[in-house]
Amino acid sequence: MSANNMRLLCLLLACYISAIVAHRPSYRSSGSDRYVDVVRASETAEAQAAALTNAAGAAASAAKLDGADWYALNRYGWEQGRPLLAKPYGPLDNLYAAALPPRSFVAEIDPVFKKSHYGGAYGGKSVTLNTGAKVAVAALN
């Protein structure tokens, strides 16, 4: 073997050993009550998948809620005797993601409650409410 190949082999061996030593859990106890959490790859992968699922659900739900007509939703709630008191807080991505229970999603917004691109008289909102609609927003767990 040439000297360069030997140096390369030693360098790779040193990197390999340092990687093994760095990721090995330490079970020594030095006077204090210390413990080591052993992280399993399956638990980490499941937690990452759950976080991605929750984030995707929150983003999709926020996009659906951003397209809702809040005035129509509140008026429908008052007509049914159960005020919703929904308020538009601007883009709901961060706000809704923070308040969203894990793995909950807004299933569908009734087309009646979607924003209209056409305004009423003098640019006001024109809302036509179909009181036969039974569900405005449905949350799944």
Swiss-Prot record:
Protein name as it appears in the record: Chorion protein S16
GO cellular component, one term: egg chorion
UniProt similarity note: Belongs to the chorion protein S16 family.
Keyword Secreted: yes
Protein task: Chorion membrane (egg shell) protein; plays a role in protecting the egg from the environment.
Keyword Secreted (UniProt): yes
Phylogenetic lineage: Eukaryota, Metazoa, Ecdysozoa, Arthropoda, Hexapoda
Locations listed in the record: Secreted
UniProt organism field: Drosophila subobscura (Fruit fly)
Superkingdom assignment: Eukaryota
